[in-house]
UniProtKB/Swiss-Prot annotation:
Negative results: does not have activity on gamma-chains of fibrinogen (FGG), and does not coagulate human plasma. Does not induce or inhibit platelet aggregation. Its EC number is 3.4.21.-. CDD domains: Tryp_SPc. Snake venom serine protease with strong beta-fibrinogenolytic activities, angiotensin I (AGT)-degrading activities and strong kallikrein-like activities in vitro, releasing bradykinin from kininogen (KNG1). Intravenous injection mildly lowers blood pressure in experimental rats, which may be explained by the action on angiotensin I and kininogen. Exhibits amidase activity against N-benzoyl-Pro-Phe-Arg-p-nitroanilide in vitro. Residues 1-18 form the signal peptide. Disulfide bonds join C31-C162, C49-C65, C97-C255, C141-C209, C173-C188, C199-C224. InterPro entries: Peptidase_S1_PA (IPR009003), Peptidase_S1_PA_chymotrypsin (IPR043504), Peptidase_S1A (IPR001314), Trypsin_dom (IPR001254), TRYPSIN_HIS (IPR018114), TRYPSIN_SER (IPR033116). This is Beta-fibrinogenase mucrofibrase-5.
Length: 257
């Protein structure tokens, strides 16, 4: 069984003390407050996702995180403890590969959001650069986000959790999940023995390999963090031309086939 890594909340309360009914980094520890200035929290239609700030006006996340009434929070660490750098934005524009519905578990699960207003760089807000080279199998990768720390029940932290996993050969994921095509524009990452993984509610967040932003959390096994069931991540490097084209104003830019 597979799980797209975003789950519904039963009720959205005030952000300062909300407890979200979604899942997050399994097997991780609290992120250092200074290591994720690019990490954003996305709320929409009673759901939660992550995302990555790539410049002062643009956020990259997963296409399946699209919804109405979207709110994007930047500069956040603790949900309960406000800080002077926290900012709220809403989308001005959203861009997809072909359409908002034309994605699969292995292709085009990517969304580029233009914020309604730019954000200023601060101690807790700063963009993450797009990758300068393709990812390498065997790389150590960092995942991060807010949500449950248990694969079987909702146990939600107030602060984002971080964990290190490995970039695996795509064939490992093909062996784990029936129906994956021979080639795709996704990355396979996890720990073969299990215990560490992204999970529901992490969707759209970053996969950072050897210091470079290489992937977007997309989907994986259910329950999360099981042996020989890694996660699937949209390959950012494969979509660079599309991302750069959209940001430059070419709204006709197309994703790779």
């Amino acid at each position: 069984m597979v799980l797209i890594r975003v789950l519904a909340n039963l009720l959205i309360l005030q952000l300062s003390y909300a407890q979200k009914s979604s899942e997050l980094i399994i097997g991780g520890d609290e992120c250092n407050i200074n290591e994720h200035p690019f990490l954003v929290l996305v709320y929409y239609d009673d759901y939660q996702c992550g995302g990555t700030l790539i410049n002062e006006e643009w956020v990259l996340t997963a296409a399946h995180c699209n919804g109405e009434n979207m709110e994007i929070y930047l500069g956040m660490h603790s949900k309960k403890v406000p800080n002077k750098d926290r900012r709220r934005r809403v989308p001005k524009e959203k861009f997809f590969c072909d359409s908002s519905k034309n994605y699969t578990k292995w292709n085009k699960d990517i969304m580029l959001i233009r914020l309604n207003r730019p954000v200023r760089k601060s101690a807790h807000i700063a963009p993450l650069s797009l990758p300068s080279s393709p990812p390498s199998v065997g790389s150590v990768c960092r995942i991060m986000g807010w949500g449950t720390i248990s694969p079987t029940k909702v146990t939600l932290p107030d602060v984002p959790r971080c964990a290190n996993i490995n970039l695996l050969d795509y064939e490992v994921c093909r062996a784990a999940y029936a129906g994956l095509p021979a080639t795709s524009r996704t990355l396979c990452a996890g720990i073969l023995e299990g215990g560490k993984d992204s999970c529901g509610g992490d969707s759209g967040g970053p996969l950072i390999c050897n210091g470079q932003f290489q992937g977007i959390v997309s989907w994986g096994g259910d329950p999360c963090a099981q042996p020989h069931e890694p996660g699937l991540y949209t390959n950012v490097f494969d979509h660079l031309d599309w991302i750069k084209g959209i940001i430059a104003g070419n709204t006709d830019a197309t994703c790779p086939p």
